[in-house]
């Protein structure tokens, strides 16, 4: 296993410049009454570990950043959120350190949708400030799992604690899933709007409390470890394929 923290300093010098460096990032936040706070971080970490095992591409895995931008879930006990300013500062310091070590390509493996917009900003800034080639991969977001774990009852509103995440957790860590607490929670009232939505031409600011009484935005009731296995393997395969393409990617010289 190629773990950044397992290298000695002098050994790392020899491989940093030629290796992709993977930084998984997740969250510690509520996922409804049935899933643990660590859900996003655990899935991102497991996908990253398996992708490192399977990829032929020279790559090194950094320790996961477990805290993310989770302000939309702060109403719920247990959620820990960094502010956008703090998380950007952490990522900037990370980029500066990696650039000093000779790293050329950094890949963020994001396990939490709330991090996405900020990670896009950070990716641009790290390119501008330190010359790092930065990439953002979403290994398991529900939107990427629709063809693998489908549930008509979710109707396009499966963004948090639904069948996809619950199935993944039943496969990876079933002892942390409270099967007796599975409950469908869908903001059906959003269907009356044709333009406003999660993936439509008009997006909106929201908290989980605006959309759900129990923190779930989805329908986990049909979740299964078998579906979770399919979803996990699809996520890993997607990351491995992305890493191979990222390794070959270069900007042209003008």
Task: Name the predicted role of every residue range.
Residues 1-107, 113-254:
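Extended, histidine- and acidic-residue-enriched regions that form the cofactor-binding/catalytic faces
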């Amino acid at each position: 296993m190629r773990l950044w923290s397992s290298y000695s300093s002098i050994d790392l010098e020899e491989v940093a410049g030629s290796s992709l460096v993977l930084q998984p990032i997740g969250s510690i936040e509520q996922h409804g009454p049935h899933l643990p706070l660590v859900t996003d971080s655990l899935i991102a970490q497991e996908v990253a570990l398996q992708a490192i095992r399977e990829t032929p591409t020279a790559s090194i895995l950094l320790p996961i950043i477990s805290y993310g931008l989770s302000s939309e879930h702060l109403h719920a006990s247990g959620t820990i959120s960094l502010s956008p300013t703090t998380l950007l500062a952490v990522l900037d310091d990370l980029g500066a350190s990696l650039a000093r070590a000779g790293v050329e390509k950094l890949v963020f493996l994001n396990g939490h949708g709330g991090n996405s917009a900020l990670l896009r900003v950070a990716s641009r800034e790290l390119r501008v400030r330190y010359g790092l080639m930065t990439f953002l991969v979403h290994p398991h977001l529900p939107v990427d799992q629709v063809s693998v774990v489908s549930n008509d009852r979710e109707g396009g509103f499966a963004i948090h604690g639904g069948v996809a995440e619950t199935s993944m957790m039943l496969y990876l860590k079933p002892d942390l899933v409270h099967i007796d607490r599975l409950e469908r929670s869908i903001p059906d009232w959003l269907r009356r709007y044709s333009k406003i939505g999660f993936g439509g031409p008009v997006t909106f600011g929201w908290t989980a409390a605006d959309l759900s009484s129990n923190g779930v935005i989805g329908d986990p009731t049909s979740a299964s470890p078998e579906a979770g296995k399919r979803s996990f393997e699809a996520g890993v395969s997607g990351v491995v394929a992305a890493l191979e393409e990222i390794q070959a990617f270069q900007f042209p010289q003008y």
